[in-house]
Regions:
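Recognition helix of helix-turn-helix/homeodomain-like DNA-binding domains
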Residues: 30-46, 53-55
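A short, Lys/Arg-rich alpha-helix, primarily the initiator
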Residues: 1-20, 67
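Short polybasic/polar patches that bind polyanions
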Residues: 16, 27, 56
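Short, charged recognition helix plus adjacent turn
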Residues: 66-92
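Short, charged amphipathic recognition helices of the HTH superfamily
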Residues: 20-24, 47
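DNA major-groove recognition helix of helix-turn-helix/homeodomain DNA-binding modules
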Residues: 49-69
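Key DNA-contact positions within bacterial/archaeal DNA-binding proteins
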Residues: 23, 34, 63
């Protein structure tokens, strides 16, 4: 089973590489500070709205962030549901 890596971890690295704080990024993205500061801390996911804002500010693909978030969400769900589904759902 793959290890779940929250996309906020990669955002934290990106911010560090650009010497940019999460609060400053929030200001530049036009969103409340908490919406961004919670992402690197793993307390909030990256929404489609944020992906498009990151695309404009960081020149990254919105699909990059969306794919990271989806992969993380699926991995976490699999970890939570895996055993139960093996018992409850019959394989084809």
């Amino acid at each position: 089973m793959p290890v779940a890596v929250h996309p906020g971890r990669l955002l934290r690295r990106e911010l560090a590489a650009r010497k940019l704080s999460a609060s400053r990024l929030a200001l530049e993205l036009g969103v409340p500070s908490g919406r961004i500061t919670d992402i690197p801390n793993g307390k909030r996911g990256i929404t489609p709205d944020i992906t498009f804002r990151l695309e404009r500010r960081l020149a990254t693909s919105p699909h990059f962030w969306t794919n990271l978030q989806t992969r993380y969400d699926l991995t976490v769900a699999e970890e939570k549901l895996g055993r139960r589904l093996a018992v409850e759902v019959r394989a084809a």
